[in-house]
Amino acid sequence: MQVKFCGFTQPSDIKMAAQLGVDAVGLVFYPPSPRAVTIEQAQLLSASLPAFISVVALVVNMPRAELIELANHVPFDIIQFHGDETPEQCQQLASAVNKRWIKALRINTEQHTTVSVSAQIDEFAAAGANSILLDAYHPHKYGGTGARFDWSLLPQDSSLPIILAGGLDADNVAATLDLPIYAVDVSGGIESGKGKKDAAKMRAFMKAVKRDRWQNETPSEPSNIGN
């Protein structure tokens, strides 16, 4: 199981996540979000990471010129389209900056079925997505609500690797280990406040997901990561 921690704003938090063994970190480039960062902040945050941890740029309906500007200044690895972007728009935008990409789909438990979710995933797979992220639907927000959707809607034979998001924390993430997913994505479940990560919550989350690694090991906290 791969783990992505999203919504970093502080270098000390991102360094701790790296030490705990996170696979990817998300930076939010959507000004209305309380976790949004500027280009300058993102440069500092990405520079705090060691090699082999992916930096994911979360964008919401970002114009092409703005995305190109972002890619020219921030060394991110993957785009996470979290707005109303169509498959074609995602493909064109990602090609403009030569990046791999993820599309977030907001799942409405009252309206979606497993078949409809699978059909949406197929559309983005055909456009070249590398993975799909499934989050809970909210009528006025694009994500980060801390809400869960009905996990029984997850397709068993998805055409893309599924990243599960929405309302995850150390207490419930173990229940996802048998789901047909590739990764989990968490933000609020590892925070003490919006954009402020909690070291104990991050540690507990990683311990719950990557139990084998943590069974006989308590990672140290070297001070030289990212320095």
For each predicted feature, which ranges?
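Conserved N-terminal beta1-alpha1 strand-loop-helix module at the mouth
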Residues: 1-227
